[in-house]
Amino acid sequence: MTGMETVAETGPRVEEGHRTPVITITVTAVFTALVSASTFLFQIPIPSTQGYFNLGDIMIFISGLTFGPTIGGFSGGVGSSLSDAVGGFGTFAPFTLVIKGLEGYVAGWISQRSSSRGILLIAWAAGSIVMVLGYFLAESFFIALVFGSSDFTGIAAASAEVPFNILQVVGGGIVAIPVSVGIKHVIRSTAFSSRILGPLKGHTAKKS
């Protein structure tokens, strides 16, 4: 059998432990849509900062903790900023793109080599700090700049949203960590786990 016949029979080979581009694009698109929908459909406005409480962090953490930094970062940033843009909060969209993107990326980067609950908890905490601190700094600057308020007024208004943001990420972690563990467990039962999840420390894909 020639080399060409072998390729024709088996198809292109995918290096073990690496996601295929098709899977990456598909999962990214799905989670970008889920982040956007969960952010847009479940909102509680916060008048003091012109922002809103939402459930998007649940999906951001699920995508990052389960599928790593690329998918977590893209879906978090793009999905959340799209929701801002179409939901009447377009002035916040650039801040959201960066902050929520970093939230998903950091959580995914820390958790990508291990699936232990301890590492997932650390990854969630790091992503949460990025989100809460990022919005505090952005809103402090934005409120003072747009409304012509003093720096103190901007900080005071941004501080009013901190408890809501903390509640948002805590709720996201409570849901996302067990869901991520469950998704990984189900995927690992297949013969293609490393092609979906990517390489994980201490995990060997099941051989078919």
Tell where the protein language model's regions lie, with residue ranges:
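Loop-helix junctions at membrane interfaces
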Residues: 1-208
